[in-house]
Amino acid sequence: MERRLHIVSFDVPYPADYGGVIDVYYKIKALADQGVSIILHCYQYGRPEQKKLENLCEKVYYYPRLKGIFSALSREPYIIYSRRSQSLLSHLLEDDAPILFEGLHTCHFLSHPALSNRLRIVRACNIEHEYYHYLAK
């Protein structure tokens, strides 16, 4: 049985030089070391594409973060709505492998009807509602 996993990351996880991406990068490395075939999806805003990730993953896709006023006016939180990409959805639909959404940031397609038959896992990085509550003060 082939072990394959989609990982949707809120940022490019290499170099592993700050909290959230450290966790994502070393998770990818550990899973790859165990023979899991990883299809990595990264939202990109300021961090360049990384060849090192291509050595660990079967495929690596990069998507722009959609910043601007229209993303800010959504009913969905900005950190989620600005990370929406129809290309991501298309790539997720190419197979039936499980999907790991890294952080609430990446969950725009979590409840999409086309993914209803898929195993979908959300790994919360922080207690997000408390984190943003205190940032707002």
Language-model features, listed with the residues they occupy:
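N-terminal subdomain of nucleotide-sugar transferases
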Residues: M1-V60, D96
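Glycine-rich nucleotide phosphate-binding loop and flanking beta-alpha elements
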Residues: Y14, H105-H108, E128
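Short, well-ordered alpha-helical microsegments
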Residues: R47-Q50, T106-S111
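Active-site regions of enzymes building and remodeling cell-envelope glycoconjugates
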Residues: L53-P64, N117-I121
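A short, charged, and often flexible helix/loop element on the N-terminal side
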Residues: V60-L89
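Acceptor-binding helix/loop patch of EC 2.4 sugar-transfer enzymes
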Residues: K67-E76, R120-K137
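Short N-terminal targeting/anchoring amphipathic segment
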Residues: S90-H108, I121
